[in-house]
Amino acid sequence: MHRRATPAMLVTVLLLAVLAGCSTGAPARRTPAAPAAPEPTAVATPQVAAGHAPVNPYPVGVRNLKLNRTGRALPVKIWYPAAGEIGDPARSGAAAAKGRFPVVMFSHGLGGRPDDYATLLTRWAAAGFVVAAPTFPHTSRGADNNVLDVLNQPADVSYALDQVLALDAKADDQLQGRLDADRVAAAGHSAGGVTTIGLFTANRDERLDAGVVFAGTALGVGTAFAGTAAPQLFVHGQLDKVVEYAAGKAAYDKVPWPKAMLSLPKGDHGQTMLKDKAALRVVSDTSIDFLRWSLYGDAAAKQRIPTGATRGDIATFDDHL
């Protein structure tokens, strides 16, 4: 169901519109947004039991899933750990590796598509995560660029998560018995970052154990973080002209849970962060270690994060994990 636009929402559209220049199953368990941000909670570890994080990288498989939420077409691209030889390119329809893997839902930015982020998302899958990325009906490349529709996207992600997790019990599916519904994160870039923040605030999905926000802001979704503590990693370029660094930092400052912010002094809205080889390596390694800790309970990964995040003087790291 589409959310009715209120005057407050319409005001945010004027600010969200600057983003338009950027191109780059089971019912969801949600709780209502709190009227104000909750008091900070001193949580030293994620709310996920320690698992067995992969020791070695996996080959990667890719597949597509056709979804539709009450008339909203939501094709989903899935990258997943696959069987085979390391070094092979991502293979369509490859058999999944043995094991049960955490799920990461990724949301693209305005004018973007999941494939724009394939390098990063393939690395996540190789590290032992099933990454599912919807193409949103009104904010993807070639769509009508209805910026207000970003406010409907958190519900799209929750619906897509329902359907992805249902594959775990679907007979003869590639991902049957491969998905760990108790280890789930959301991530997104730009408007996808807004979508991701919304999944922890106004549209809280309690299945989510962690979040990764790239160049995002809380415009339209607020900062009333609600529900069980879920660690958050923010990544933002300090030269971002689309979503200013200060806007991302303001949202980060409101997070009441374990959190960290990776800041790139020479980073822009996405090209440096997601395309530049040196910066991408820092971003991907930091985000992988964050996900290993928050979804697998890998304490060694948490210890690596501060050193890896600041190597090469590419980024600074504010650590409250």
Region annotations inferred by a language model:
Residues 23-26:
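Bacterial signal peptide processing site
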Residues 116, 147-181, 198:
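Alpha/beta-hydrolase active-site loop
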Residues 29-105, 116, 123-127:
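Domain-level recognition of soluble alpha/beta enzyme cores
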Residues 243-253, 276:
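Short alpha-helix in the alpha/beta-hydrolase fold that links the catalytic acid
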Residues 18-21:
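C-terminal motif of bacterial Sec signal peptides marking the signal peptidase cleavage site
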Residues 276-321:
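Alpha/beta-hydrolase-fold serine-hydrolase catalytic core, especially in secreted/extracellular enzymes
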Residues 228, 234-236, 240:
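Short beta-strand/loop motif that positions the catalytic acidic residue
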Residues 239-243, 269-270:
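Acidic catalytic loop of the alpha/beta-hydrolase fold
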